């Protein structure tokens, strides 16, 4: 698997006093699950858009596997907060849709789509339509669609933000399972501190005005889940709680500085 790198990238939007990103560097190594945590306006969505090739930096560079990112590509799959499923297609056909656009033969794409649905525990739901699926199931289909293309990197834009707390935790555990099985690099953005700590092998805390990385951590908790600890046990662990409170204090300190700036 290849590394996803941003090297001293800066982005300024027209009419904004501060850059959305100011000299940000981040390396998402092969097989890593990197999470960008921060409040609205910190530049985390802009950073994801750069990795996806949806936009380009004003300065600095973005590469995947050492090759400059020149636009969207099948090797970098994006999972959005809203599922974006086509309502007239079944779950299986939604998963296979991107493969169809790439000219993959019908039998092969249906096999790949079926395998991807099985990876997200929806093997029996291929014939269902989006209106027959719960919110969590729709997001599973979105993840399966990314997996079916055998992308080397998954880019996830607050994928569980619209889900209830119970379903969100289920989806977090599913993501760790899929990540472990696929070996893909994952870059996920969130404003949820607990989610970031639980999922990340590398966590970067970002601050707004201008968007910068102000803290980097390597939490052990996703590795512990892979070793057999439950999500509930991990999230009630004193080490987890202490790190959560420290990050919360960091975010509040940023907000206080902004108020006095």
Curated annotation (Swiss-Prot):
Xref: Gene3D superfamilies: P-loop containing nucleotide triphosphate hydrolases
Membrane-spanning ranges: none
Catalysed transformations (reactions): taurine(out) + ATP + H2O = taurine(in) + ADP + phosphate + H(+)
Binding site for ATP: 38-45
Keyword ATP-binding: yes
InterPro entries in the record: AAA+_ATPase, ABC_transporter-like_ATP-bd, ABC_transporter-like_CS, ABC_transporter_ATP-bind, P-loop_NTPase
Main location as per UniProt: membrane
One family name in Pfam for this protein: ABC_tran
Protein name in the entry: Taurine import ATP-binding protein TauB
GN (gene name): tauB
